[in-house]
UniProtKB/Swiss-Prot annotation:
Pfam families (alphabetical): Acyl_transf_3
Protein name: O-acetyltransferase OatA
EC main group: transferase
Signal sequence segment: none
Gene3D superfamilies membership: SGNH hydrolase
Primary gene name: oatA
Amino acid sequence: MDTKDFKRLEKMYSPRYLPGLDGLRAFAVIGIIIYHLNAQWLSGGFLGVDTFFVISGYLITSLLISEYYRTQKIDLLEFWKRRLKRLIPAVLFLICVVLTFTLIFKPELIIQMKRDAIAAIFYVSNWWYISQNVDYFNQFAIEPLKHLWSLAIEEQFYLLFPLVITFLLHRFKPRNIIQTLFIVSLISLGLMIVIHFITGDNSRVYFGTDTRLQTLLLGCILAFIWPPFALKKDISKKIVVSLDIIGISGFAVLMTLFFIVGDQDQWIYNGGFYIISFATLFIIAIAVHPSSLFAKFLSMKPLLIIGKRSYSLYLWHYPIIVFVNSYYVQGQIPVYVYIIEILLTALMAEISYRFIETPIRKKGFKAFAFLPKKKGQFARTVLVILLLVPSIVVLSGQFDALGKQHEAEKKEKKTEFKTTKKKVVKKDKQEDKQTANSKEDIKKSSPLLIGDSVMVDIGNVFTKKIPNAQIDGKVGRQLVDATPIVKSQYKDYAKKGQKVVVELGTNGAFTKDQLNELLDSFGKADIYLVSIRVPRDYEGRINKLIYEAAEKRSNVHLVDWYKASAGHPEYFAYDGIHLEYAGSKALTDLIVKTMETHATNKK
């Protein structure tokens, strides 16, 4: 490329502020926050992360090629310095607060937090969670730094991509660069599909830099095709209308997906993320156009305020939600708690944005110089020191012993429970005799209980009630996994008079056909089907299928755990799914009572 070309391009690629992108960021971060507050409210809110990825790829590439066309080079050190000032101080502030809070209020989590924090500091959280087999979509574990996986991917991208794009710009034409980036994006897509097919692990492909690169690269490609700083403002009204129709349509599709997509939908791991990200390109393209009315909509002041703070809001919302929710049972959290979480998120995000991020962005690390005469700067420095000291001590491992001690104490408390005396109700003698016989029959029976981790929870309690019961519970089991096991191992139970308890659906949705196939595999056996209580978006759909099966099939009897457990937070562990001893006892009693009632009615 000769000097004349560079001079022409220099005028075209002068950077300018793109408010439409901040407006789009606002919608993305709101979606993410709502999803983490309660996935049942916005099941596809997690797609906001993909929106961030596409925006990042687009904006960073636009800035890099703008610099290259204006100066005929890219100052990599200056680029990395800007990224460092923009991203790292806020993350370090967050980590210090989280570690200090953990030390004071959640000492049993010290060791886990130390490891997660180290991974976050070095921006390898995503690979750390993959190595630890962490499930991203398990929102019930107390992992307040888990959301930093996406920042790890972005930072890895910021570190390596400028090197790649500099090399490509020096040696190839834009058309060839676009082709190269497109091919690599397809390779990333292929890796996601293949790895997901082989492992069946949603979180591996969700966390992986290799499998998520596709989304970032689509944004990079758009930067070459639709450079924001080269777009003309003076265009015909027809073109403006066409642009707005495209932008509004794409935005409507994305918002619809936020509501209808679920994190257990398998299609999103088999090309869905790529398609959704591709559709997002059209929204971005119109959002950055200087003549678009849609861009003006995204540039409204409330959206800009949220968008400019989207990074801070993303950082703070998750640990606040996780820590506050840890004092409540998931799925039974009062509305006022959600309001408190939103207010705390806004407060901490504003503190981070105003007193940490903005000063460093303007003054660099001089903003933390120890100047007692400047009250604001002095207070900021003292706060950082107060948070930094305990954080460094935690990271050094000095409190590991304390963490182990509290962890052991908490495990012991899990076995504690309260019992209450029930009022005795007098019954007819004949009824008492039938009930007694039924109870004795049930106690001597040998039912099969098949289920997931909830079945594991009740196993020991249930066998004390019915010693001959066969318990087959497995952590993470889904209904579709149980059907082949039943057909191969439990054929003897597919006979009239046999008793089977089925407790499945906690770990993911299933279809009517899949449920029918499982029930059919038990033949004419008496099946006791347990409804589920799980604070996820599929809870209602699954229970509807369970209720319908119990109503339509004469040999299927409903064990309505969903109804019986309502208003009993003491039954559940923090996640609102797994059971404390009181819950295990209550579910066991409910199953046994249902079996006894059915046995009595038969007589």
